Regions:
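NTP-dependent small-molecule kinase module
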Residues: 70, 143-209
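Small-molecule kinase domains that catalyze NTP-dependent phosphoryl transfer to phosphate-bearing small molecules
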Residues: 40-47, 119-164, 190-194
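ATP-dependent small-molecule kinase phosphotransfer cores
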Residues: 18-78
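Glycine-rich phosphate-binding P-loop
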Residues: 1-6
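Conserved nucleotide-binding/hydrolysis micro-motifs of P-loop NTPases
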Residues: 86-87, 102-108, 160-162
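Conserved phosphate-donor/acceptor-positioning beta-strand/loop module used by diverse small-molecule
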Residues: 92-114, 120-130
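Post-Walker A helix-loop "phosphate-sensing" segment adjacent to the P-loop in P-loop NTPases
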Residues: 9-15
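RNA pseudouridine synthases
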Residues: 72-79, 83-93, 97, 111
């Protein structure tokens, strides 16, 4: 809900489960054949890696998704994405803001029961399985801890703030960080341009970027 709200505020694409459809379309896959492997940990018992290549469908799909994310970002397109190790995949880019949204267990349980129409017992099992898979998936592909605040720009408890206030804070942060990232990008570009095209100031001295 929060991620979708942010995407609407900035009028940019939103990627979550629908990323599967984009990857399938790009690689001529049948969505139904790969959707079960989305953000799933690799099943080591049934897969192997030979000379750097894996036959694991989970690994293959993850690689295709990471490539899609990188290509979109490199093209200059702005977007909001949930999960898929995007914070790690795009860690070397300036104009990226990453957030980890947490919620109290009771709030997560209630929302899961309502949105998925599940009993309390089934909702608890769903949350536990989802978090376990996300944690393993993130660790497998980044060698870092899922949810560790050091890996994100900001960690926010949406139960305390509510969805709207959480989205407000994210919007303000993104506007600030992306402005700084843009200025940094322009600075790098101008520095390279001056190296290739030396200029002199009014006193005849070479112009340099600070």
């Amino acid at each position: 809900v929060i991620a979708q709200d942010i995407a609407k505020r900035f009028n940019v694409p939103y990627y979550n489960r629908n990323l599967i459809e984009e990857v399938a379309k790009q690689n001529n896959f049948d969505t139904d054949n790969i959707k079960d492997y989305d953000e799933s940990p690799r099943k080591y018992l049934f897969s192997r890696t030979v000379q750097g290549y894996s036959n694991s469908p989970e690994e293959i799909l993850a690689g295709l998704q990471f490539d899609f994310i990188k290509e979109k970002a490199a093209s200059g397109e702005s977007f909001v994405i949930v999960g898929r190790c995007a914070d790690y995949v795009l860690k070397d880019m300036d104009c990226v803001a990453s957030f980890f949204i947490v919620a109290d267990n009771e709030a997560k349980l209630q929302r899961t029961m309502e949105t998925k129409q599940l009993s309390q017992r089934d909702a608890e099992a769903t949350i536990k399985r989802h978090d376990r898979n996300r944690k393993t998936y993130y660790k497998d592909h980044t060698d870092m801890e899922w949810g560790n605040s050091k890996n994100y720009d900001m960690t926010i408890n949406s139960t305390v703030l509510g969805f709207k206030k959480t989205a407000d804070i994210i919007e303000d942060f993104v506007k600030t960080k992306l402005t700084e990232g843009y200025l940094k990008f322009v600075g790098k570009y101008m520095h390279r341009w001056l190296q290739d095209n030396p200029q002199e100031d009014e006193n005849g001295k070479p112009m340099e970027m600070g």
